[in-house]
């Protein structure tokens, strides 16, 4: 598997872990869910942090690039979980963010 594909898949897995870790407390606080949702939420956020450590690039670069993938994944979450169709502007914005991620992660670096 190519480095670019591996990086993208790792970012998507990281975003899903973060989204789940934030959505479960939302269900508890706003939708009357059980307080027990906080346990899997904490586990999911721990997985999120661990996944961020798996990238070989400098942490600041990883965090900056990850943000682009998070935005695109959050829009998929909006569509699949919240059942709200993203607008063309949402999709254009996500495309710009993914382009930024690609520039940050895959541009040539000097020695």
From Swiss-Prot:
The chain crosses the membrane at residues 8-28, 34-54, 62-82, 91-111. Keywords: Cell inner membrane, Cell membrane, Membrane, Transmembrane, Transmembrane helix. It is a multi-pass membrane protein. It is found in: Cell inner membrane. InterPro entries: UPF0060. The keyword Transmembrane applies. SUPFAM superfamilies: Multidrug resistance efflux transporter EmrE (SSF103481). Its main location: membrane. GO terms for cellular component: plasma membrane. It comes from the Bacteria. Belongs to the UPF0060 family. This is UPF0060 membrane protein XCC2880. It comes from Xanthomonas campestris pv. campestris (strain ATCC 33913 / DSM 3586 / NCPPB 528 / LMG 568 / P 25).
């Amino acid at each position: 598997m190519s480095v670019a594909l591996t990086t993208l898949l790792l970012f998507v897995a990281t975003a899903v872990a973060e989204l789940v870790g934030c959505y479960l407390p939302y269900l508890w606080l706003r939708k009357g869910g059980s307080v027990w949702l906080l346990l899997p939420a904490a586990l999911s956020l721990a997985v999120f942090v661990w996944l961020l450590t798996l990238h070989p690039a400098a942490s600041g670069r990883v965090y900056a690039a990850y943000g682009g993938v998070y935005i695109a994944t959050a829009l998929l979450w909006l569509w699949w979980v919240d059942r709200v169709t993203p607008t063309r502007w949402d999709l254009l914005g996500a495309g710009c963010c993914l382009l930024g991620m690609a520039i940050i992660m895959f541009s040539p670096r000097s020695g």
